[in-house]
């Protein structure tokens, strides 16, 4: 009996068409309907299509950077300082930074400003005759000398050389010759004579030795034959050679008498005895 009642009860009736049933939650139904109407796949296809369609347009329009053409016509007015013209006002404004000495800013000078212009050749021809009339004779002579110097061609100036009279070696200065003359300590009468040569490199780069072999020069260097030290000039070598000469001449100087120094007691005694001997010998 209970089982028959359960089958006859309409509350347990299952509908065959769920679409006809009303949804108890209207918000859920609106969300489901909106999700079915706007699918994310369609949005992706639209965005891809729009990007693909816009890409050839962007590729067809490359970025254009304008570069200044030096051969382009100058459309601006000239610079008030140097007179140069430019192809754009922006270039002219940038160029005005090269003139920081001007008294104003910008490209427009003050209304009372006058640009100093150089005098033309015609104006100079008109001014010079009037100026010449005020010149004195000395000014004329100085001006003529300056004109001769400016118009004259540079003459081939001869180089003065100094030759040693003993070994006929030629040097370019008095100092070098003086150092070389010191090497001729045993040669007397070594004097310098001026010799003018056209080739300045004939002697300065020569290498060899003099007739006594005292000084050896290799590629412009002077070598001492005693201690074999090398010097860059003959003057330096001559000053160095004096050290060896003073050492050699010391014993000779010690044995000689110096008249500027008073004699000692021992010297007086020897001189007296020597005088007596001389008198005795003369008497005999």
UniProtKB/Swiss-Prot annotation:
A zinc finger (C2H2-type) spans 77-99, 162-184, 222-244. Induction: Activated by the transcription factor DUO1. One of its GO terms (biological process) is regulation of DNA-templated transcription. It is found in: Nucleus. It holds the Pfam family zf-C2H2_6. The gene is ZAT3. This is Zinc finger protein ZAT3. Keywords: Metal-binding, Nucleus, Repeat, Transcription, Transcription regulation, Zinc, Zinc-finger. It comes from Arabidopsis thaliana. GO terms for cellular component: nucleus. Residues 18-37 have a biased composition (Polar residues). Expressed exclusively in pollen. Residues 1-12 have a biased composition (Basic and acidic residues). Mediates the regulation of male germ cell division by DUO1. InterPro entries: Znf_C2H2_sf, Znf_C2H2_type. It comes from the Eukaryota. Residues 47-62 have a biased composition (Low complexity). One of its GO terms (molecular function) is DNA-binding transcription factor activity. Interacts (via the EAR motif) with TPL. SUPFAM superfamilies: beta-beta-alpha zinc fingers (SSF57667). Residues 1-76 are annotated as: Disordered.
